[in-house]
Amino acid sequence: MTDAEVIPLTKGLAALQTALPFIVGCGSGMVATTCVQPIDTIKVRLQLADRSVLRVTTWSIARDLMVEGGILNMYQGLSAAIMRSLVYGTMRLGLFSTFEKELARRARERGTTLSFGERSLAGVGAGALAAVVGNPTEVILIRMQTDGLKPLSQQARYSSAVDALRRIASHEGVLALWKGAGPTLIRAMSINFGQLTSFSEAKNQLQEHTSLSPPVRTAVAAGIAGCLGALISQPFDFVKTRLQNQVKTSPTVGLGSGELLYKGTFDCLFKVIHKEGLFRLYRDILPYFMRIGPHS
């Protein structure tokens, strides 16, 4: 092989190495998303329920979904969830791995190891960038999952994620696709901090201080990451769901006068805590943990 042939091959391998974290993130995210979609649909409906009026549980919602449309009804919005995974999931995992490797390289040049603070920076930065780009897919997913809660005359009945994207942008304006961007951004940063950062740190600490086998270390680290990710990000996921579900023309989520029930993140937090109590923000944490756990 000549030098001229080696150079393109080297460049190709370098490009593949750069793209590999994004490819892995995309593939693993899509598999996890498909597996947990029923739990996510239940979680969203639980978060939208007014617990001061309604007595609902994970099992009652699952039963109602099955009665309404069978097992396929549990997969409402799957096309939007896959789109979300392609955009948000790919970016958050791929960018985290890329940032972490670059920071580790710089640490080696200084003669030190990657610190927890640097890992946290990689996680928070990756989550923030992925959230900004992926917010439209979050809005689409929430709308498709909750469409069945509205009266038949008000249901949009989106045929696919692309159809939802087009119709929301057309009827409500492009900026409607960035509804709830604030809590989505904070949630993504907190998930990445609690999930990815703690997973890497826990696995590293377990390797240094225990004699656990690699598979066990990975499982324990994933459990720690899932718990921390859920605890830190649950309130922001709750607010995100409430904000992104709002449509001015729907009296089921508005005030009946064309106004939105919640004006923003803090208004939503205040009204929910005032009406339903502080514990409401964490009341549905079990299905939320089951939702994000497989992504750990």
From Swiss-Prot:
Keyword Transport: yes
Induction section of the entry: Expression is induced in response to 2-benzoxasolinone (BOA) exposure. Expression is also induced in response to 6-methoxy-2-benzoxazolinone (MBOA) and 2-aminophenol (2-AP) treatment.
Functional summary from the UniProt entry: Solute carrier protein; part of the Fusarium detoxification of benzoxazolinone cluster involved in the degradation of benzoxazolinones produced by the host plant. Maize, wheat, and rye produce the 2 benzoxazinone phytoanticipins 2,4-dihy-droxy-7-methoxy-1,4-benzoxazin-3-one (DIMBOA) and 2,4-dihydroxy-1,4-benzoxazin-3-one (DIBOA) that, due to their inherent instability once released, spontaneously degrade to the more stable corresponding benzoxazolinones, 6-methoxy-2-benzoxazolinone (MBOA) and 2-benzoxazolinone (BOA), respectively.
GO terms for cellular component: mitochondrial inner membrane
PANTHER family associated with the record: MITOCHONDRIAL DICARBOXYLATE CARRIER-RELATED
Alphabetical GO biological process terms: transmembrane transport
Native organism: Fusarium pseudograminearum (strain CS3096) (Wheat and barley crown-rot fungus)
Cysteines engaged in disulfide bonds, as pairs: none
Pfam families (alphabetical): Mito_carr
TM segment ranges: 12-32, 122-142, 219-239
Subcellular location: Mitochondrion inner membrane
Name this polypeptide is given: Solute carrier protein FPSE_08119
Residue ranges of Solcar repeats: 16-102, 114-205, 213-296
Similarity comment text for this entry: Belongs to the mitochondrial carrier (TC 2.A.29) family.
Protein origin, superkingdom: Eukaryota
Keywords: Membrane, Mitochondrion, Mitochondrion inner membrane, Repeat, Transmembrane, Transmembrane helix, Transport
Membrane topology listed for this record: Multi-pass membrane protein
Coiled-coil stretches noted in the UniProt entry, renumbered to this chain: none
Keyword Transmembrane: yes
